[in-house]
Structure formats: C-alpha cells, structure tokens
Amino acid sequence: MPSFDIVSEITLHEVRNAVENANRVLSTRYDFRGVEAVIELNEKNETIKITTESDFQLEQLIEILIGACIKRGIEHSSLDIPAESEHHGKLYSKEIKLKQGIETEMAKKITKLVKDSKIKVQTQIQGEQVRVTGKSRDDLQAVIQLVKGAELGQPFQFNNFRD
C-alpha cells in the first residue's frame, strides 16, 4: 500500500544563512547606523535572539529577518515570534523559536482534517510526524493538496513516499 510521511522540518544551515544575510543587510541600513542591533542564532536551543535599542527597531529587525528567511526558502510561519518583547536596561529583545517537528495537538488536527475529508486513507501519529497510508496514489495526492490548502499555522513537508 502506498504511504508517505507529513513532517515539519527546518534546515538549520539555511536558517544560519538567513541570519547571516539579515546581519549583512543590517550593517548596510542607514537607520541602524550607530545603533546596537544584533541578530543571533542559537543552534542548540533552535532559537534566534534579536536585540536592539527600541521596540520600533525590533519590529524592523524582525521584518529584515523574515525577508532573509523567505529568500532562503524558509516559510515565516516556521518562526514562532512572541508578541511581547523583553526589556533589559536600554535594550529590547525577542527570542524567536524555530518550529521543528509536529506537536501532538497539530498531529491530531491533521488527522481530524483528513478523516473529515472522507478520503479513504489511514493516518498514524508517529512521534513528530504523521504517516498517511492509502490504497491509491490519487488518494495520497488528494491528502497532500488538502494539508497544503489548510491554514494550520505551520509549514509541512511530505517525504518518505513508498509504493
């Protein structure tokens, strides 16, 4: 029986490149001359820390980072940007988490979405991925289009196709 896995993964190498590109753009921006502004990637914790002197500049840095991520093929929905910024002395900062893997709640939403569509496939939650098995390839392609079309707030990739 044909099957595939639904996963949510980000290549940390591409994130590193996006952060470096954002820092390069930051160094050439006129409105950030003489301002203490930093974008740092912590690969162990899978977070990006943005620090600057004002809340407005913090929002500008986030826009620069999102633009760099999109250019590197990383969807901005894979960044978990907090609404509130932290204030330490004269610096404002935000710690952006990278969404890796599918959490149990999201996996249940995907499973419910597929079951409600009445497509004749079975879904299994396997850790941080969802396996979809069906009798025909057309059913699996219908599930892929269904999941891509649903706005679930997280980018998904489809891999491990088996016939």
From Swiss-Prot:
Protein origin, superkingdom: Bacteria
GO CC annotations, alphabetized: cytosol
Record GO terms (molecular function): nucleotide binding
Pfam family, any one: DUF520
Keyword terms, alphabetized: Nucleotide-binding
InterPro entries (UniProt xref): DUF520 (IPR007551), UPF0234-like_C (IPR035571), UPF0234_N (IPR035570), YajQ-like_sf (IPR036183)
Coiled coil: none
HAMAP family with a match to the protein in the record: YajQ
Function noted in UniProt: Nucleotide-binding protein.
Family: Belongs to the YajQ family.
NCBIfam families in the record: PRK05412.1
Annotated protein name in UniProt: Nucleotide-binding protein CGSHiGG_08790
Species the sequence originates in: Haemophilus influenzae (strain PittGG)
